């Protein structure tokens, strides 16, 4: 009988390890920083209330990289709502307007693309020329920064065009945000009256349709979970993702993760972001 009790006690002692194979989110972030020899910035925010659930370096500046394209298309949709733009408007451009990594726009030199098609290309495929063409419609980097100030984001700033904005120089405040500011801005775009309900649905759908985020949080997403995201990559180890996540196919939380100043390879950076995502998912009910 005593032997049986000892076996049961031993079994119970192993259960927490079996239930939670991943570290707690903050533990995973600290581990990622150590393994990357760089900096990680992260915030997990409740979508409905705006309450911060987890944060690490949330008020430090990180390069936005291509995650700015979500905010850009939010600014475009705000112009649509105001009657100053139409998603169906066709924009024509030339070969000299194309920059590196333009997998969609480079195929439409002859016929051009609509504003809506450019937003879809910028978010779902991270098309850089599409982003520049859209930036021109909102007044360039300064115009997008002005839009951010209008909606109450006094931190995030865009100063350059694609692809120079991805330089990620140490100590350079240009083209940066903080995890907290990016999460708050994304929440405003998707839940407040800054955008119409129709435009909110459209912005979210473009993020749902993201086709270049596979190696990151999507790689560890359980069946039945919701995700809508936009990634970014830059020089000097910069990598990032802004995402909406939740079980039961429902967007419950905003997750923003940025990396910078790491010598790690792209595959290693992707793996670390996926690991942080896995820790968040495994410890969702905290």
UniProtKB/Swiss-Prot annotation:
EC class name: hydrolase
Record's signal peptide: 1-21
Record's keyword terms, sorted: Antibiotic resistance, Disulfide bond, Hydrolase, Signal
Reaction(s) the record says it catalyses: a beta-lactam + H2O = a substituted beta-amino acid
Listed EC numbers: 3.5.2.6
Pfam family, any one: Beta-lactamase2
UniProt keyword NAD present: no
UniProt binding sites for substrate: 230-232
Domain of life: Bacteria
One example GO MF annotation: beta-lactamase activity
PROSITE patterns the record matches: BETA_LACTAMASE_A
Any Gene Ontology biological process: response to antibiotic
Catalytic residues as annotated in Swiss-Prot or TrEMBL: 66 (acyl-ester intermediate), 164 (proton acceptor)
S-S bridge residues: 73-119
Keyword Membrane: no
InterPro entries: Beta-lactam/transpept-like, Beta-lactam_cat, Beta-lactam_class-A, Beta-lactam_class-A_AS
Protein function: SHV enzymes hydrolyze broad spectrum cephalosporins notably cefotaxime and ceftazidime.
Note from the entry: The class A beta-lactamase family has a specific amino-acid numbering system, sometimes called Ambler or ABL numbering and often misspelt as Amber. A multiple sequence alignment was used to derive a consensus sequence and then the consensus was numbered taking into account insertions and deletions. This allows use of identical numbers, e.g. for active site residues, despite differences in protein length. UniProt always uses natural numbering of residues, hence there appear to be differences in numbering between this entry and some papers.
Family membership: Belongs to the class-A beta-lactamase family.
PANTHER family referenced in this protein's UniProt entry, alphabetically: BETA-LACTAMASE (PTHR35333), BETA-LACTAMASE-TYPE TRANSPEPTIDASE FOLD CONTAINING PROTEIN (PTHR35333:SF3)
UniProt-recorded name of the protein: Beta-lactamase SHV-8
Source organism per UniProt: Escherichia coli
């Amino acid at each position: 009988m005593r032997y049986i009790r000892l076996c049961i006690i031993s079994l119970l002692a192993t259960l927490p390890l079996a239930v939670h194979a991943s570290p707690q989110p903050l533990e995973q972030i600290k581990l990622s920083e150590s393994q990357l020899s760089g900096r990680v910035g992260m915030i997990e925010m409740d979508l409905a209330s705006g309450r911060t659930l987890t944060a690490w370096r949330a008020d430090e500046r990180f390069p936005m990289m291509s995650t700015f394209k979500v905010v850009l298309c939010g600014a475009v949709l705000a112009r649509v709502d105001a009657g100053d733009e139409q998603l169906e408007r066709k924009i024509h451009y030339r070969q000299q307007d194309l920059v590196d990594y333009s997998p969609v726009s480079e195929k439409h030199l002859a016929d051009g693309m609509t504003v809506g098609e450019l937003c879809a290309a910028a978010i779902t495929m991270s098309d850089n020329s599409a982003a520049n063409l859209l930036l021109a419609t909102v007044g360039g980097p300064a115009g997008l920064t002005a839009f951010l100030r209008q909606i109450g984001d006094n931190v995030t700033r865009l100063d350059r065009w694609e692809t120079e904005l991805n330089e990620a120089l140490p100590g350079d405040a240009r083209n940066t945000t903080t995890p907290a500011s990016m999460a708050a801005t994304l929440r405003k775009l998707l839940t407040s009256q800054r955008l119409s309900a129709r435009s909110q649905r459209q912005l979210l759908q473009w993020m749902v349709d993201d086709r270049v985020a596979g190696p990151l949080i999507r790689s560890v997403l359980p069946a039945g979970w919701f995700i809508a995201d936009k990634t970014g990559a830059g020089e000097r180890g910069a990598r990032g993702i802004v995402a909406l996540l939740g079980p039961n196919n429902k967007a419950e939380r905003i997750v923003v993760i940025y990396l910078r100043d790491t010598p790690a390879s792209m595959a290693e950076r992707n793996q670390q972001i996926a690991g942080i995502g896995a820790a968040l998912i495994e410890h969702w009910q905290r």
